[in-house]
């Protein structure tokens, strides 16, 4: 979506991390911003921080709760307007071996990371189809490209996002609809979500990640990997290397399989 001025933008997980930064960047582009977050204190703080920057609204929403998604979507349509840009950003991680996950850990991770983007999109996609206009940006992860110990359920949830998001893009293309989909796959970001992670590849700066995402939306990019070589390197390696060689390269040379050993 090349022109964001006066567009209505909904950002889930918008009261902290890259979600909050993206909200600020959207306001700086004269967009109107709606924040969904589970933390009311952070919502209030964000609204206070941004009140002089433009039209910004905040709603406390647990995106793992379908009723809350549906009720708050209705409030937006009734009281504010039709969403032009949806950024599915909310996410959680449980950094444990799979056998250490509780059932709640598994269910909650999949509900928030995988199910919520689809269910939230369902609430707003019909309006976009009716207007033949809109942009949906789904924040996945480079973890959705590669297997990794101590984040198996998180990885599964992000694989889901990538597969669904890009399939939706192709569906909309087949329907000749002017609705753009951007799938984002960043490496670890220094927002506090991945405290304790140790990596040979530099941890990403959240300000730079958020800016790259907004620019990708403005340019209608179909996919964004940060850093850019991650996607090409991963897919190329998976295509040409036997599994044991790929494991050696990824685990020992790149150190990826050990990044979560000190996760807190």
Protein language model regions, located:
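Residue(s) in the substrate-gating loop at a strand-loop-helix junction
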Residues: 141
């Amino acid at each position: 979506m090349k022109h964001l001025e006066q567009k209505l933008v909904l950002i889930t997980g918008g009261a902290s991390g890259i979600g909050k930064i993206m909200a600020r960047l959207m306001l700086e582009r004269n967009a109107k911003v709606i924040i969904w977050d589970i933390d009311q204190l952070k919502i209030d703080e964000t609204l206070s921080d941004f009140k002089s920057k433009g039209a910004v609204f905040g709603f406390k929403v647990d995106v793992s709760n379908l009723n809350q998604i549906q009720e708050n979507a209705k409030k937006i349509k009734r009281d504010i307007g039709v969403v032009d840009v949806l950024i599915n950003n909310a996410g959680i991680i449980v950094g444990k071996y799979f056998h250490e996950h509780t059932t709640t850990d598994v269910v909650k991770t999949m509900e928030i990371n995988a199910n919520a983007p689809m269910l939230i999109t369902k609430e707003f996609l019909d309006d976009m189809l009716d207007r033949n206009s809109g942009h949906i940006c789904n924040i996945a992860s480079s973890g959705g490209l590669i297997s990794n110990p101590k984040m198996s359920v998180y990885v599964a949830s992000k694989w889901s996002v990538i597969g669904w998001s890009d399939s939706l893009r192709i569906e909309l293309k087949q329907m000749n609809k002017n609705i753009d989909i951007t799938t984002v796959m960043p490496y670890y970001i220094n927002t506090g979500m991945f405290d304790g992670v140790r990596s040979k590849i530099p941890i990403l700066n959240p300000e730079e990640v958020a800016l790259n995402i907004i620019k990708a939306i403005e340019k209608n990019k179909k996919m964004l990997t940060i850093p850019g070589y991650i996607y090409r390197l991963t897919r190329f390696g998976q295509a040409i290397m036997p599994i044991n060689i790929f494991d050696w390269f990824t685990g020992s040379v790149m150190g990826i399989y050990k990044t979560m050993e000190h996760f807190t």
